[in-house]
Amino acid sequence: MAEKLDDAARAKAVASLADSGWEDVQGRDAIHKTFVFKNFTRAFGWMTQVAIVAEKMDHHPEWSNVYKTVEVTLATHDVGGLSELDVTLAQKMDRLAQ
């Protein structure tokens, strides 16, 4: 089972993801990023790839899609905040978006 990141691990994880656009969610132990693609097909194709990865991880994002933009929030509900699962999924999302 996942464990909530302690303050030091959380700060390190968020700092490592900040360069690629991930940000803290105000008032919540979560991270957020806006992905913008060339068009709807690319956005939806990326979401499909991420869905397969997320299902294999048994860790699912909160997300929404409007045309070529995908808003993503990551947190581990079972632990009430960020876990290593969120960091790993964020990194995989970034790689798939390249």
UniProtKB/Swiss-Prot annotation:
Cited HAMAP family: Pterin_4_alpha
Organism field: Jannaschia sp. (strain CCS1)
Protein name: Putative pterin-4-alpha-carbinolamine dehydratase
Enzyme class: lyase
Keywords, ordered alphabetically: Lyase
Secretion signal span: none
Catalytic activity from the UniProt record: (4aS,6R)-4a-hydroxy-L-erythro-5,6,7,8-tetrahydrobiopterin = (6R)-L-erythro-6,7-dihydrobiopterin + H2O
Transmembrane segments: none
Pfam family, one: Pterin_4a
Listed GO biological process terms: tetrahydrobiopterin biosynthetic process
EC number(s) recorded for this UniProt protein: 4.2.1.96
